[in-house]
Structures are given as C-alpha cells and as structure tokens.
Amino acid sequence: MEKVSLARGTRDFGPAQMAKRSFIIDTIKKVFQQYGFQPLETPAMENLSTLQGKYGEEGDQLLFKILNSGDFLKNVNKKNIEEGNWKMVTGDIAEKGLRYDLTVPFARYVVMNRHEITFPFKRYQIQPVWRADRPQKGRYREFYQCDADVVGTNSLMCEAEIILMIKDAFNKLGILDYTIKVNHRGVLSGLAGLLSAAEKETSLFVAIDKLDKIGEQKVKEELIERGFDAASLPQLFEVLNFTGSTQNKINFLSSKFSNSEIGKKGLNDLNEVLNLLKNFGATDEHVELDLTLARGLSYYTGCIFEVKINRASVGSVSGGGRYDNLTAVFDSKEKSSGVGFSFGIDRLYDAMEELSLFPKETISTSKILIVHLDKESFHYSLKAAQTIRLNGIACEVYPDQTKIKKQMEYADKKNIPFVVVIGSEEIKTNLFTLKKMETGEQSKLTIEQIIKSIK
C-alpha cells in the first residue's frame, strides 16, 4: 500500500478545527460588514506577469509557478537549458502562478474595474495564499490571509475605523488583553531628522525595529556601524525610551519636532485619529504609540498598525497601514490612496487555542442525536429529525440499526449535547426520552416540548 502524506508546509483541518476557524472567520466577516466592507474573491492563480516584480527578488523566488498544460517543453530555448539560464526557462514553461498575497490581486482588480467601482471602495477578502518558503514552526506554504482595505480616500476616519474594527472583532472573539501599536511614517522621518540623517532613514528604521529583540546597546552599536554619529544617539534614545500615554508621547514629540514639517504632519495625523475615536464615542484604550514600529516602509506612507495579544506566545496577529500607490505597480500614472489591514487567521487560531478562548459550543455540529431501538423506531426517527431541523435545531439520526451503547458512544465522541431515545413504547405514548449528555439528566417529553426546551 502506498504511504500517503501531506505536501510539506500544508495542513489538514478536521471538523473540530474547522468549527473553531469558522468561528474566527465568521466573527471577523460580520465586523467587516457592519462597517460597510464588501466581499471580494480573486482567482487562486494569476498570470506570472501580474505577480513578478511586485515582491522584490526574494519574493519572486517564493512564487509557486504552474507548468503550462500540454507539451510545456515545446517553446523552450535549448540554449537557455545548456547555459543554465533557469529564469528564462521558467518563463518558457510557466505563464501562471499561485497568488502570493491578496494585495497584488486586489490592485489588479481595482485597475481592471476602476470605471465600474464606486469609490471610496471598501473591500474585504479572506482566501488562501501560497509561498514556496522553507516550512518551519508557524510558517506554512499554504495559509489564509484576511484583508480589509478602503481605497480612493485620504480621510483619517478610515484609520479610526480600523482601530474600532480590531477592537470589535477582539471583543466578539473574547480577546480582552491586547495592544494595538500605532506609528506614522512621518514620525519615523522626524526621528531621522533628530540625527540629521534623512538620507539614512531606512538604515535607522531597520535598526530601531530590532530594539525589543536585541536591546538598546546592540542597536546603538549597529547604528554606529551604519555611520550614525554616536554623539547624537542619546537624543534619539531619550525619545524612544519616553514612557506615558499615547497622548503624552505625542505632546512630548511635538517639542522635539519643531523643525521637522514631516514629523509634525505625522503627529497631527495621529492626534486626529485619536480625536476621531472620541467622536465615535470610543477611547484610546489598548492603543499605544510605539516609535520602534517600522513595518512595510517600502509602501506605507502614513499611519502604521500592528496588533499583539499580550499573553500569547505568537507574534503579531494583525497589521497594516496607509499607502498612496496601491495601483502604481500596474499603472505609474494611477495612484490610489488608501488604508488597509490584515488579520492573521492562523496566528489568531493558535493564540486563542493557547489561551483557551474558544467557546465550547464551537466544537459540536449537531445539538441532538436521535437514538433508535428497532426498525420501526428508525423510520419514525426520520420524520422526528426533520421536524426538529425545520425548527432551526441541528439534528442527526444514527444511520445504522445497532446497539444503543454504540449510538450513545457516537454522541459522546462528537460532543453532541442531547440525545433523544425513540423506541416502540415512546412511539405509543408520544413521549420521548431526552438525555442531557453532560449531566446524564433525563426527562420524558413530546417532540414539540423537546424543541421548545432546546431552543
């Protein structure tokens, strides 16, 4: 017999896992929809010309390519094979690839449909993506992304709504101890201005992003190695080490950025987002200005977000930011400003599992199992089951005529909370035994009474 196995970097999700994943996805979907976001789906495969060149050289190497159908070697230039020019060979044998993320397909969709789309366009998208990465703990070749974006507006109300959506989703998922870290591209540029090193912004951001991983001393050493003036570093770390509320940090930075227009613009944007939260009737609870947050600097141009669940061992479970050039990758003349963020479904799942946050009711699929004692009661069970289902209660009938013990074990293993026992005596009296599996408590009821008691 051939040994069967999964492809490396992929996973199966059994019924119990799928119930939990569906709980997360359905909860997030409802939150997106409450804020006016509409669903979008794009194909699993895209033309390689759409995907290549959008993720840098390293990203291009992680694209899963799809062999052309039929005689895929027909158009291959043999000279390229002889010379080991595999990039050219790949172009000859593969014209399509699996999507690497949801952002590039979204940008392609916006460009192709810009005359039909109503802007500002609010979309959410929950689909799997594929990366030819080296599999390791927490890193898979197939995983789900869960994105929400608003494109076609500069309004900072969108940033405030992102914070509200994260709060609403976490509240509904039962996640209460978390931090929404925020920063701004302009604030980061203002920090570079403190060191008179605007031309070395990227080097500065890469270094300070490591602060919580390698510590202050190592970051200082790295900055000096990168050519920063050691005498100016105390001023930088005075700012980075300042503690207090988000509002206090903004006030403190205002005095430091008196000569930085871009820094002041960043602070004003953050201040406006906080004010908009108040206008929504919310607070800045869980929101923290983190000056070391420097994600996505190649494309984020305004506010930046990252979310961590404080007692979980997983890393960030959500992140995003403001961008000004979503569609520029396809049309340099077309620049669509927008803001978006993403939930990591797999990391959210791992964190909720670790912290035992899943409600018990997410596990079972059926509320009732009907157990039958003979052929007559089996046939009666079918009608009873349909009556129960038509009243909105998930119900199943054990499909085989077998011992009651085996039927009860089935209910126990599937975590079905109630069992209804039907035999010839029950059919005569129209009273059926309803057993609560958790406690063993039993009562004699009509089908109508059973429906009423469980609803």
Regions found by a protein language model. Name each.
Residues 61-73, 197-218, 309-310:
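Acidic, His- and aromatic-enriched active-site or binding-groove loops in soluble protein domains
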